[in-house]
From Swiss-Prot:
GO terms for molecular function: metalloendopeptidase activity; zinc ion binding. GO terms for cellular component: plasma membrane. Keywords: Cell membrane, Hydrolase, Membrane, Metal-binding, Metalloprotease, Protease, Transmembrane, Transmembrane helix, Zinc. Its cofactor is Zn(2+). Belongs to the peptidase M48B family. This is Protease HtpX homolog 2. The chain crosses the membrane at residues 15-35, 37-57, 151-171, 185-205.
């Protein structure tokens, strides 16, 4: 049975405001590059090609990076049954399902659209969670698929990536041309503005990522009708992460942005640099939803 996908207007408002700020920063940056005489065509083409590959082949890249193995219904019947049932409720096509052989208890989703998605779980999470908790985690990942989060964040980071490459290479290549910038002062100005744009956009993209994690948590609660199950799973995963050997955690640290909980997380002081909200904030939202649904 399909469930109504109710909107959280406050969360949507924060996401839209963040995207508005991001767009404003990007428009300023493009206007500045045009005024300074910087020909951004080459950089646009280079970064566009790079991000196009990421956009269209992200699922294959992530599977290769993690060593995830696509499993058939005969190989993982219970997992397939769970995902099939959740997809009917969420009203999305069933994605491919993969398993990663690692003790790290985690899960992730990738793919540019609901029709080209992969949802993966680790053997660590399958061994430790109850069926209800695992179902809640899968519903969280399917919410990312339904919300097209991979596509949104790839597009959002496009100009930020251009700013990063200008910062990295402009001093080496004399600012990449442009009449107004042939002097050292002009090159330095472009470099400084690019740094500012990259830092601001980096923080905004991280904020957008955290909001979309909140949205996926909310989606899981709506799909399963049991926010407490995801809350229980998050607490269990967070606690289990401390018991996993640091060597195993470092192997998958590059996948933190995709995981339901980062394999290695910093202090609360570093929250503004994190792709995920703190577990405490996520639990507070789920507790509020549990009360609303009771």
């Amino acid at each position: 049975m399909k469930r109504k996908w109710e909107r959280d207007l406050g969360l949507q408002g924060r996401m839209l405001f963040t995207m508005f700020l991001l767009a404003a920063v990007y428009l300023f940056f493009l206007a500045f590059l045009s005024y300074s005489g910087t020909p951004p065509v080459f950089m646009l083409l280079f970064v566009g090609a790079f991000m196009g590959i990421q956009y269209f082949y992200s699922d294959k890249m992530v599977l290769w990076t993690t060593g995830a193995h696509i499993v058939s219904e005969s190989e993982a019947p219970q997992l397939h049954d769970m995902v099939t049932r959740l997809c009917v409720i969420a009203d999305i096509p069933k994605p491919q399902i993969a398993i990663v052989q690692t003790r790290v208890p985690n899960a992730f989703a990738t793919g540019r659209s609901p029709n080209k998605a992969v949802v993966a779980v680790t053997t660590g999470i399958m061994d430790k969670l109850t069926p209800a908790e695992l179902e809640a985690v899968l519903a969280h990942e399917l919410s990312h698929v339904k919300n097209r989060d991979m596509a949104v964040l790839t597009i959002a980071s496009f100009i930020s990536t251009i700013a990063f490459y200008i910062v990295r290479y402009s001093l080496y290549f004399g600012g990449m041309g442009g009449d107004r910038r042939r002097d050292g002062g002009g090159i330095l100005l472009v470099w400084l503005v690019s740094i500012a744009v990259w830092v601001v956009s980096f923080l905004l993209i991280r904020a957008l990522s955290r909001y979309r994690e909140f949205a996926a948590d909310r989606g899981s609660a709506i799909i399963t009708g049991q926010p407490a199950n995801l809350a229980s799973a998050l607490m269990k995963i967070s606690g289990l992460m401390d018991r996993v050997p640091s060597e195993d955690l470092r192997k998958v640290e590059g996948m933190n942005a995709f995981f339901i909980i980062p394999a290695i997380s910093g202090s609360s002081f570093m929250d503004i640099f994190s792709t995920h909200p703190s577990v405490e904030k996520r639990l507070a939202q789920l507790e509020k939803m549990q009360k609303e649904m009771s």
